Each structure stands twice: as structure tokens, then as C-alpha cells.
Amino acid sequence: MLKHNESHSKDFKSLNEWLYYLETIHTTEIDLGLSRISQVAKRLSIDFSFARVITVAGTNGKGTTCAFLENALLGEPAPSDLSIDEEECALTQSVAVYSSPHIEHFNERLRINKCNVDDQSLIKAFKEIEIARADISLSYYEYTTLAAFLVLMAVKPEVIILEVGLGGRLDATNIIDADVAVVTTVDIDHQAFLGNDRETIGFEKAGIMRGNQHIIIGDPNAPQSVLNYANKVNDEQEYNNQAAAYKKIKVRNRDFFNILPTSSHSQCSSNWQWLYKEFDSEGHEIEFCLNDLNNTKIPQDNVVTALMVLKQLGIKLTSKKVNALINQTQVAGRTELFKAPVFNKSALDDHEIITYKLNSDVMLDVGHNPHAGRYLAAKLTQFKSQNQYQRIIAVVGMLADKDIANTLLPFQGIIDDWHVAPLSVLRTASSEKMVTQLSSFTKSINCFDNITQAFKMA
């Protein structure tokens, strides 16, 4: 029973009041570590033993992988445990996803059966945390993560998908021992917190892995640090035979593959294939293949990884089912396409809903590192090669601590005009800084006071 602490009792009536308060109570915006949140979680008796938990880490692709899994698992039979030999049984009643950050509304961070959490559930959770934490200082992210966990404990979904916020090893979500650990991609980002090279960053992301847990490594060229971490936690467990141990770790381009129609291994005339290999207890190779899969609007790498997760969960996969999921899955702000003539979206400066009448389509993408830049540039190149668009204008704002030069360089020769502006946050890069980075490969740059103005003039 928690004792009421008057000095930490808050009675804010609205969610916005709580969120404003949370921004003021911790000195550091990003403060990695599990010590503080673990203490408070223990006081709150955080326990997810009622659910199967999937934790997803990675530089890019986390949100899309989570969304694909969410769509796939809703209404699917849920195995009583996560053995791939387990027969499917009762229907899954609910699937919850915790992710960050949000695009328009804070409630987007936690959705249950694809519905965003309501204000009152969050307010109730915030009050409980405020009493429980006493004199322990929590960052905004730690506090809101605990709130999501309290809501999940009240709702008790059968499947919980956790998207790591930053890194993995020291991220607040890592207080939970998941049943499945997924690492999507490893690339350079958040160097001040995670390190300056893929090996160091990979180690941080691999920190979500546990022994006796299904581990899915989705990076097609995973750093050795990720593989070493997976093998280390796996070696610490006792298995009946090596085949049982091998089944726990699945690595892209070793155990599962995407095969393009141009490949000599492809057996279909168009689209692509997903191939999975494993060995039985006698060492015989077993193959499973999904043929004629649709080309994806979302990154194919994420679909490839998510399918391996589903296979490990014992979900029956068919090409028809997977194609339906590919067509269904879209994540806000990830190559999100709004068709002319009307585009409704929150203005970035004042958060009011504004209706823009457009003469052109608009693609919204929140990519902010070189890996994401390369993917988006490839998408736009594809559009141009198919003569879908004659002219592409980029409206760009970035944070000052991002690798602006290498994120924007892949767009050389693709973007016709650049509209740059500062974001409405303290960490924003100035227009001048972005111009300096862009001027090495383009002269068609226009500066604006804010993103809304830059967008209106595009």
C-alpha cells in the first residue's frame, strides 16, 4: 500500500497540465539509466507476467515493425507460450503498442487494439507515480513510460509491443524482460549517448536481449557486437541440444532472407520472396518460403524482420495474409503521402489544425539520420524514374546535434528546391547551419523563419 506523500501530491485536472509539469521536474531531458525508474517500478509493482512482450530496438524501422506486428497479431490465435512448435489456441483479445515520440497528441504513445489511450487513464497513472516516486527524480520519458506501464497493467492485453526510445540497454523500456527481443537496424545516430560507431551503438541496442528469449536480428549487415551479445546471453542458458539453442536466435541473411525477382534464387517472375531456413534436431535443413509478395510502401527490411518475429510466435503465414498486411500497414510520418488537393495536418508552430489546398502531393517523413536519409532518397528516386513527379521541393528542419550533412547528401540531384527553416524547439539547427551543409551540392536554397512559412511557400 502506497502512503500518501503530501509534498509530491499533484491534482492537475488536465493531461496538458501534467505534461507541462513533467517537463519541469528533472534537470536533464535525456538521462539514460535504469536505477531511478527501476526503484519506482518496484514500488508500483510493475509486472507484465500476464502478457507476451515483444521489445523492438533499432536505429530506424522500430515504429513500422511494431505497426506491422500489431496488425498481424490482432485477431490472431495466441500461443500459450512462445515455442514455435506450440499449437495455436485461443484468439488474441488485445494487442498494445507503446511507442515514442508522438506526432500530434501525447495519447498516440500508447494504443490498445489500435485505439489511443484516453486522458483520464494517463492522469490516474501520473497521480500514482507522483506519490510512489517520493524524492526520486524521473525524466519526462521515464515518468511517461511508467504511466503507460500502469495503464497496461490495468487493461492486461495479451500481447504488449514495446518500442525502445533510445538505444536499448539503458532505455526505460528495458526494465521489462521481454519474451522476444528485436533489433531492426543499427546505424549512426544519437552519438552523444550511444557512441560514434556501429559496433558501439550495436552493443547498446543489443542490451534488450535476455537468455532463454527469442532474439531476432534484422539488420542485413549486423555489427559483430550485436551477434556477440546474442550468443553470450544464449550461451548462458542450458538447452537439451544445440538445435534448441540455435532456434532462439534468428539472424537476417543467415536464417531469413528477402529474395528479389532479379536474384538467381528467385522462383517467381515478379515481386519478392521471403525465405526462412532452420535445421531440425538431426541437422537436416528445413525451408519455408512465401512467394509473390507485394512491393511495399513501408521499408521492406522491416517487413522481412517482422515476418521472422511472427514465425517465431507460431503465427501461420501465407502470401495472401502477408500481402494484406503490407497493404494495410502505414505509420504516421514515415513516407506518409497526402494526395492533392487537400491536406489536413497540425501546423508545427501553433498545433492548430489547418486545411491546406494543394496543387501537389505532400510526403511527410520524420527521418533524421543518414540511414533514414538514404532510404527516403531512394524512394524519391524511384518516383522520379517512374515519372510520377516532375519536380520535388523539400521543406526541411533538423536538430542541431544531428548529422545534417550526411542525412541530406543522399538527396543530391533529387531535390529541385530546398526550403529550410528552424524548428520551434531549443535544439533546432539554424537555417544558416543547414544552408552551409546544403551549399556543397546545391544552390537552390530558400530560408524561412519557421517550418509553417516554408511549407506554405513550397
Task: Name each model-derived stretch.
Residues 3-10, 76-93, 234-247, 252-255, ...:
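Intrinsically disordered, low-complexity terminal tails and inter-domain linkers enriched
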Residues 54-58:
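Hydrophobic anchor at the beta1->P-loop junction of P-loop NTPases
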Residues 159-163, 178-323:
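Acidic, Mg2+-coordinating active-site environments of NTP-dependent enzymes
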Residues 216, 220-225, 229-232, 243-245, ...:
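C-terminal helical cap/extension that packs against the catalytic core
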